[in-house]
């Protein structure tokens, strides 16, 4: 008898699905270091007013914790619709919005509805690492088309890939993670027009970093492509609500009807809904940090370029830079300097989040000591 019941067996001993054997789970290191720049969070903490509002809002719902929450999160979705209408300039209503526990749950629900066994999803790589993981988890066949040498998306090449593969789901990340480039509305139209040539097929435009982007939101295209386009977003990045775990999508009302078929009952807790609504009431204050982060991004980009690094131009709150002979070894050197950044698996490149000015200074000081490749 060991101290941990059941520790005599391993994952290999379980009747796991064959298609999951050999897979690796998602994981960004969570280490205690002086400077953490690896998960693209907004480094500015919530204001005292926001903290007080969240605390009061949670206190108000605490008396009803013995009851299930609003299973459709109507009040939260209404607030999100109002925020999106103001932020993007495209009027949307509660009927256009769906919310869940982070945008990853949104993506999972979309793959449950539109992917699954016998269906496929196409991604343009390198891009967000959870897209293939969620595809695998929903038994959706994962297909890839490569981005260019600068990691940008060539719309003509991407449209050709859509026509060739006729996927059931297409992922387009804008701004792209980990490279940072946005996709223009004209290029998105080209991809959507290619998708319209086939029966079925849905394009998911992942706008997790949309508040940082210089390009208009794809939400403005939903009216023209109601059966083809879904836009996903999150409160974890610019909104500085990563600990709150709220993501959402914007689409034609019929897509929300599809989500109702696959969501788990009462999936968003009363506490989550109350806290998120409080955060939305302070959107102007929170998003005031976006301009500061963009200015810091440009400062860090210029400094790294001046040191001799190759910096991929970014439209988000992070920078992909290189070119290193051994990216994993260089990542360790940064960690030894007390700076945690991200090895995203692209040979020769590392990604850093834009942090507070003093955190960025620490990154630049470490970069100067490490030296450009």
From Swiss-Prot:
Residue positions where N6-(pyridoxal phosphate)lysine is found in the record: 237
Classification via InterPro entries: Aminotrans_II_pyridoxalP_BS (IPR001917), Aminotransferase_I/II_large (IPR004839), HisP_aminotrans (IPR005861), PyrdxlP-dep_Trfase (IPR015424), PyrdxlP-dep_Trfase_major (IPR015421), PyrdxlP-dep_Trfase_small (IPR015422)
EC class of the enzyme, as a word: transferase
GO BP annotations listed: L-histidine biosynthetic process
Keyword tags: Amino-acid biosynthesis, Aminotransferase, Histidine biosynthesis, Pyridoxal phosphate, Transferase
Cofactor(s) in the UniProt record: pyridoxal 5'-phosphate
Self-association and partners: Homodimer.
UniProt family annotation: Belongs to the class-II pyridoxal-phosphate-dependent aminotransferase family. Histidinol-phosphate aminotransferase subfamily.
Protein name: Histidinol-phosphate aminotransferase
UniProt organism field: Mycolicibacterium vanbaalenii (strain DSM 7251 / JCM 13017 / BCRC 16820 / KCTC 9966 / NRRL B-24157 / PYR-1)
Taxonomic lineage from the root: Bacteria, Bacillati, Actinomycetota, Actinomycetes, Mycobacteriales
């Amino acid at each position: 008898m060991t101290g941990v019941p059941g520790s005599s067996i391993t994952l290999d001993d379980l009747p796991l699905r064959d298609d999951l054997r050999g897979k690796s789970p998602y994981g960004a290191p969570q280490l205690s270091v002086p400077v953490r720049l690896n998960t693209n969070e907004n480094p500015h903490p919530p204001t005292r007013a926001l903290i007080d509002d969240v605390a009061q809002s949670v206190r108000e719902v605490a008396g009803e914790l013995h009851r299930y929450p609003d299973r459709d999160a109507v009040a939260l979705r209404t607030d999100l619709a109002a925020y999106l209408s103001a932020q993007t300039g495209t009027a949307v209503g509660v009927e256009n919005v769906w919310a869940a526990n982070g945008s990853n749950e949104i993506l999972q629900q979309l793959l449950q509805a539109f992917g699954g066994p016998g269906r496929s999803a196409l991604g343009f790589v390198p891009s967000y690492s959870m897209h293939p993981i969620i595809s695998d988890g929903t038994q959706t066949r994962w297909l890839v088309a490569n981005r260019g040498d600068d990691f940008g998306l060539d719309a003509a090449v991407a449209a050709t890939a859509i026509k060739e593969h006729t996927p059931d789901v297409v992922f387009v990340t804008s701004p792209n993670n980990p490279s940072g480039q946005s996709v223009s509305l004209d290029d998105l139209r080209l991809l959507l027009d290619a998708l319209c040539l086939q029966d079925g097929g849905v394009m998911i435009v992942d706008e997790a970093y949309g508040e940082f982007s210089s390009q208009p939101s794809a939400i403005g295209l939903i009216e023209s492509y109601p059966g083809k386009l879904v836009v996903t977003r999150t409160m974890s990045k610019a909104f500085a609500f990563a600990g709150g775990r709220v993501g959402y999508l914007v689409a034609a009302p019929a897509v929300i009807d599809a989500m109702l078929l696959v969501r788990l009952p009462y999936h968003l807790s009363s506490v989550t809904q109350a806290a998120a609504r409080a955060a939305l009431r302070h959107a102007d204050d929170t998003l005031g940090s976006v301009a500061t982060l963009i200015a810091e991004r440009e400062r860090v980009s210029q400094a790294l370029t001046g040191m001799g690094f190759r910096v991929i131009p970014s439209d988000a709150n992070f920078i992909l830079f290189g070119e290193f002979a051994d990216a994993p070894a260089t990542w360790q050197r940064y960690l030894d300097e007390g700076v945690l950044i991200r090895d995203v698996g692209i040979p020769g490149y590392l990604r850093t989040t834009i942090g507070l000015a003093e955190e960025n200074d620490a990154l630049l000081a470490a970069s100067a000591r490490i030296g450009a490749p």
